[in-house]
Amino acid sequence: YVKFVAYDPVLNRGRGYWEETLARNVSPGLNNSTMPHELANTGPTTFTFGPISYKARLTGDDNTNPQPSFVGKKINSTFFYSNRFGVLSEDNVIFGVANDTYNFFSRSALTQTDADPIDLNVSSVRPVRLSDVLPSPQGLLLFSERQQFQVYATDASILTPASAVIRTLSNYEMATNIPPVDIGTTSAFVSRVPGYSKLFTMALRDVEQSPVVVDISKAVLEWIPDTVDDLTVSPPNSVVMLVDRDTSYLYMYRFYNNGKEDLFQAWVKWELPGTIQTARIVNDAVTVVSQQEDEYTIGSIELDELPSGDAVATSSSFTGNVPLDMTTRPVKPNASTDAVVYDTANDITKIYVPYTPINDKDAVMLLTVPTADKGTDAELDSDQGYWAKATER
């Protein structure tokens, strides 16, 4: 389909040229309101959520420049890879135009270029619903509930409509509600069986070889509950952490690899105060949002070998790693009240904390006082109330 474009745009006649155009009675493109939206950081403390302006279809028709295969179907995941915006929908993976974000249509209906969109089907004998993706040096990893796939370029160069292919990697079951994660040179995903969960790692080899898949939770078989519902990692610290939200437990796997094999592997279970809402490892620190009775708190602990978190700073230079058990310094509840206040009427010292004291937890104070003063009582206070007793250590 072409249209005549005159050199004289006013008279629109005379000399000119023919330009590709869109066929009549053909949809010009995608409905922005039903497509993935964006959450944009518009300021230090502000975000804006809204639709994205996807590029319109400018040439051809449904045969020569078809709609992407996700139209009329549910989109399961979005990603960016090889300078393309990608989408997972049912058993298809769709890449937009290269270096043209949010464009899923070819620029020309007459000629195919390397930048044109790519639409591939995994073609399996089993029902497949692609749920997650992870990048790798050998290509793009695709995950579904029962199979794993790899997208790569046959000529080992850039991904194009002519060079992109999909191959089946493995047939392991995966909990699709827990996104897989990248641990440096390997990937990790959770498999759930009745009564407990398993944690697998996958390491890719050459394109013609099968991946190496290892059940790293085999040493603690049936120890990880089937209620874990999140996964976070720290590749520099060789840490994988499973989160059991709405409980008090974190399950941590830590290892040491010399470049060839794991020389050390260990599993640890942490019990935290309150119920965990979410947990993430960012910048070598575990940050946990938890609910303590009727309020939410944020705690963090560093994972590096030499703790640098400052819990207490005194003349004795005592420092410690800020933990996840609600450790805090005294905090002023308001501008007119000090963080530590002596109550002369009741002969006690009130130490204010930035959260409401937890009724079923024992408070522990770390005091740097002369030996003669030990044994004195103190109460931890907040705006809503304070503990009746605190234990000194």
Question: Where is each model-derived feature located?
Answer:
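Generic detector of intrinsically disordered, low-complexity, polar/charged segments
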Residues: L11-R13, V26, E173-M174, A372, ...
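Short, surface-exposed terminal/edge motifs of secreted or surface/virion proteins that either
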Residues: V2-F4, G16, I94-G96, S290, ...
